[in-house]
């Protein structure tokens, strides 16, 4: 199949390999981006690429807590300048408080909620857009519930560019916040290895088995080396197996155990993750404005 320049660019952006290497991998993978990434990794030419590495939209994330419910939201704007102003921040908190109180099923349902007489949440967002001169959108949210014996931990990093919300059982709010801080900083994908889907593990195993540095090694040696690499891979993506950000001498599992608690669930949002950023040529923009 024909490989486009856009496909080559996307693969290069995700793996930092040369143009010809990217094109060859895409040809071999019949244009499948994820398969091409795996092929490059097998050749030792690219580091593991995470989906959604390219961050695009501006905006902020925020966590609102009300009793046994909490909501984490992402509100997007076109520029970080608007994301930092008072009108946007007021809207951010208003949206989060509405979502945590009403617990809508999805974004569409949230936008239809009546927040004031005759005014929906969408109307409120549009009103702020008119004030700021930029398009503002509610991209996503999650509403999380806990029991009376559990605690929420919430943490926002870099002025709201990243937020994390965690539920712990048995441990204090302070311990929960420390774990939320870890989640914001280290970005685990799952609580424990038991949550990692089998296909994710099988894919990683296939990549490692095909690695060129294992070629020619006896099967029993190869199997042991791959087993070790899978263990390392799981430790990198699962919260409980990661070195605790506040004390690298212990894992998160060891920390929460020392607090007589356990981690039930978590949500982590980073502004714009998974959305490709529009790159603007400043000189071209100025030229257009000058006519």
UniProtKB/Swiss-Prot annotation:
GO cellular component, one term: cytoplasm
SUPFAM superfamilies xrefs: Elongation factor Ts (EF-Ts), dimerisation domain, UBA-like
RNA-binding found in the keyword field: no
Keyword presence, Protein biosynthesis: yes
GO terms assigned for molecular function: translation elongation factor activity
Domain of life: Bacteria
Localization (cell): Cytoplasm
Coiled-coil zones: none
Region (Involved in Mg(2+) ion dislocation from EF-Tu): 79-82
UniProtKB keywords: Cytoplasm, Elongation factor, Protein biosynthesis
Pfam families listed in its UniProt record: EF_TS
InterPro entries to which the protein is assigned, alphabetical: EF-Ts_dimer_sf, Transl_elong_EFTs/EF1B, Transl_elong_EFTs/EF1B_dimer, Transl_elong_Ts_CS, UBA-like_sf
Cited PROSITE patterns: EF_TS_1
Homology family: Belongs to the EF-Ts family.
Function as written in the Swiss-Prot or TrEMBL entry: Associates with the EF-Tu.GDP complex and induces the exchange of GDP to GTP. It remains bound to the aminoacyl-tRNA.EF-Tu.GTP complex up to the GTP hydrolysis stage on the ribosome.
Protein name: Elongation factor Ts
């Amino acid at each position: 199949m024909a490989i486009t320049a856009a496909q080559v660019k996307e693969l290069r952006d995700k793996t930092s390999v040369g143009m010809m290497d990217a094109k060859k991998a895409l040809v071999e993978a019949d244009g499948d981006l994820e398969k091409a990434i795996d092929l490059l990794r097998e050749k030792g030419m690219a580091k593991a690429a995470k989906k959604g590495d390219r961050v695009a939209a501006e905006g902020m994330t925020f966590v609102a807590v009300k009793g046994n419910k909490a909501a984490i939201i992402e509100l997007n704007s076109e520029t970080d300048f608007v994301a930092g102003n008072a009108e946007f921040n007021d809207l951010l908190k208003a949206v989060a408080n509405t979502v945590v109180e009403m617990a809508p099923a999805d974004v569409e349902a949230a936008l239809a909620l009546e927040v004031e007489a005759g005014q929906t949440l969408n109307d409120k967002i549009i009103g702020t857009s008119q004030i700021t001169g930029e398009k503002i959108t509610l991209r996503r949210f999650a509403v999380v519930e806990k029991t009376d014996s559990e605690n929420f931990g919430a943490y926002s990093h870099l002025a709201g560019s990243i937020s994390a919300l965690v539920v712990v059982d048995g441990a204090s709010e302070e311990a929960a916040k420390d774990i939320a801080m870890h989640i914001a900083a280290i970005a685990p994908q799952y609580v424990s290895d038991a949550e990692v889907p089998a296909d994710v593990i099988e894919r990683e195993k296939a990549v490692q088995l095909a690695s060129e540095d294992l070629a020619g090694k006896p099967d029993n040696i190869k199997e042991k080396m791959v087993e070790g690499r899978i263990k390392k891979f799981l430790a990198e993506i699962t919260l409980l197996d990661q070195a605790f950000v506040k004390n690298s001498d212990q894992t998160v599992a060891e920390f929460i155990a020392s607090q007589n608690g356990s981690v039930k669930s978590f949500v982590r949002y980073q502004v714009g993750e998974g959305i490709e950023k529009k790159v603007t040529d400043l000189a071209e923009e100025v030229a257009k404005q000058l006519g």
